[in-house]
Amino acid sequence: MNSAWFKKALPHIIAIGIFLIVSVIFCKPALDSSQTLQQSDITQFQGMSHQLLERQKEKGEGALWMTNMFSGMPSYQVSYPAAWSPVNLFHDIFTLYLPKPINFFFLMCISMYFLLLVLKCRPWTAIIRALAFAFCSYTPIALSAGHDTKIFTLGYVPATLAAMVLIFDKKYLWGFTLTALFTAMQLGMNHQQINFYFFIIAAILTAAYLINWIRQKQLAHAGKALGLLVIAATIGVGVNVLNLWVNADYTKSSKRGGMLVMDKKDNKDKSPVENSRTVGLQKDYAFQWSYGRMESFSLMFPGITGYGSYYSSKDGEQHLFPKLTDNSNVYKQSVKTLTKLISEKNNVPEVQAEAQAESQAENFTLGV
């Protein structure tokens, strides 16, 4: 009995071992206590939260208001002592208490591996595909920028989808339990943009199964599956309801709740306006954090629109990578466009703006 169980579990044990070894090797500098991963957003967060953390040390309790951001704002939007949550416990278990950034890659590996197994992929092919998912070029780019919550949220997406598929495949108990768990985990990582994209995928997946059930006249199963899915999702949301509620309320007073329009020129993309405020975030601003049109092809062809300009530091020396050569298309196009514009205008800001428009420049975010 034990021998049969071990034989069945062996491929999965090997898979976890491979994911752990590859993640550790890829993030080997993290094992050196003298080296620290430099993340711009995390550095900014440390600066923003410094006043709050110092007061917390002095008074022994967190402050509800901070004065060093935007002339004052609620502190829970930056840093506030959070109450204990089962999400934190399960997150540590799923990441094996691994140090940063090893834990990011390991989580993404096991989550995608779980989804692939549920989709009936063989363990050996699932290992390769899970590694491809976790170590795609976007992951280290996002981590270098400090988008920790984004990567953790993205890491739980495959697991949540897998749990949904279990419900749809009539494995009700496991599907319901894991859907509630992974919904709570995913929302608990607190990156609502990724959750928004997940809901689109989940809706398409559910619609596809529903159409198939209707065709096969499995209406009883459809009703049971959808009912369990709604209840499980409600439990997952309920675990995080406090955080979601206060953020939704604060959004109304933030830029994402609409921008004040004093002049028609302020509303460049002609967003709907109510009570002198735009409805939601302006499209031009929101899409600055998306891949550019050609940049999306970097998923298959790395460096198709050039590379970023991040650098690493070691032994006091900075190393810029990769080098932009005189023969690169990005360099040639930039020189051509700027030379033409500078010869026509003397206004530097105007030259910069037109250079971006005329050369069809990609967004400022990296997507190698």
Model-derived regions: residue spans:
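Polar, glycine-rich mid-to-C-terminal structural blocks
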Residues: 224-291
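Membrane-interface starts of transmembrane alpha-helices
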Residues: 10-14, 91-100, 121-129, 175, ...
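Juxtamembrane helix-loop transition sites at the ends of transmembrane segments
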Residues: 44, 81, 157, 208, ...
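Membrane-embedded helix bundles of polyisoprenyl
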Residues: 19, 109-118, 124-213, 225-247
